[in-house]
UniProtKB/Swiss-Prot annotation:
Gene Ontology cellular component list: cytoplasm
Protein name: Probable transaldolase
Pathway in which this enzyme or protein is active: Carbohydrate degradation; pentose phosphate pathway; D-glyceraldehyde 3-phosphate and beta-D-fructose 6-phosphate from D-ribose 5-phosphate and D-xylulose 5-phosphate (non-oxidative stage): step 2/3
Keyword Cytoplasm: yes
GO molecular function, one term: aldehyde-lyase activity
Native species: Desulfosudis oleivorans (strain DSM 6200 / JCM 39069 / Hxd3)
Pfam families, A to Z: TAL_FSA
HAMAP family the UniProt entry points to: Transaldolase_3b
Function: Transaldolase is important for the balance of metabolites in the pentose-phosphate pathway.
Gene Ontology BP terms: carbohydrate metabolic process; pentose-phosphate shunt
EC main group: transferase
Alphabetized PANTHER family for the sequence: FRUCTOSE-6-PHOSPHATE ALDOLASE 1-RELATED, TRANSALDOLASE
Family: Belongs to the transaldolase family. Type 3B subfamily.
The keyword Cytoplasm appears for this protein: yes
Length: 214
């Protein structure tokens, strides 16, 4: 399973790259707004650091505007993937962009039928938001499982990016289910590497070493 980093913070991305954990990056307008600098510069800087897909989201809600923005974004770097919202206008934009060879990531997916429609429109990636479903007392990972089943039924090659990840369990479940990608906030990524028994083991080794050197 590929690890994408869900952030626009260049320092977090660089740390993830050093760990070998940044197969790609996903951004959105909210993440971009947290950083200093203009949108295009931030995206270019991310592309310079990461050797993998970088999702940049359009702001327009109408098909023509989405396509216009997407074409401009696609000129910034060859690794750019255009994030398109899961709407009727978004599906039209995805179809048009796919015909022009521009990769897309359909975002804000909350049902398996939305994911199927995105794939049929020609999406390169689809992003089910598991954490937001969990917030509504639903099980977001059930959605991922359903999408995987549907895609497997029809040999659909659209990749599934498990998004809105809130904790390590989401990542574990995504891996066990066979999702293509988990896009992970940097704070959650660090938690994946941690375990109390690892810390206790290190402390024990160091204490034993100190005793042996006396």
């Amino acid at each position: 399973m590929k690890f994408f980093i869900d952030t626009a913070n260049i320092d977090e991305i660089k740390e993830a790259v050093k760990m070998g954990m940044a197969d790609g990056v996903t951004t959105n307008p909210s993440l971009i707004a947290k950083e200093s600098g203009d949108f295009e510069t931030i995206i270019k800087n991310i592309c310079d650091v990461v050797d993998g897909p970088v999702s940049a989201e359009v702001i327009s809600l109408k098909t023509a505007g989405m396509v216009k923005e997407a074409k401009q974004l696609a000129t910034l770097h060859e690794n750019i993937v255009i994030k398109i919202p899961m709407t009727v206008d978004g599906l039209k934009a995805v179809r048009m962009l796919a015909d022009q060879g521009i990769r897309t990531n359909v975002t804000l997916v909350f049902s398996p039928l939305q994911a199927l429609m995105a794939a049929k429109a020609g999406a390169t990636y689809v992003s089910p938001f598991v954490g937001r479903l969990d917030d509504l007392a639903s099980d977001g990972m059930v959605l991922v499982e359903q999408i995987i089943d549907i895609y497997d039924n029809y040999a659909i090659d659209t990749e599934i990016i498990v998004a809105s990840i809130r904790n390590p369990l989401h990542v574990l479940d995504a891996a066990l289910m066979g999702a293509d990608v988990a896009t992970i906030p940097f704070g959650v990524l660090k938690k994946l590497a941690a375990h109390p028994l690892t810390d206790r083991g290190i402390d024990a080794f160091l204490n034993d070493w100190k005793k042996a050197k006396k």
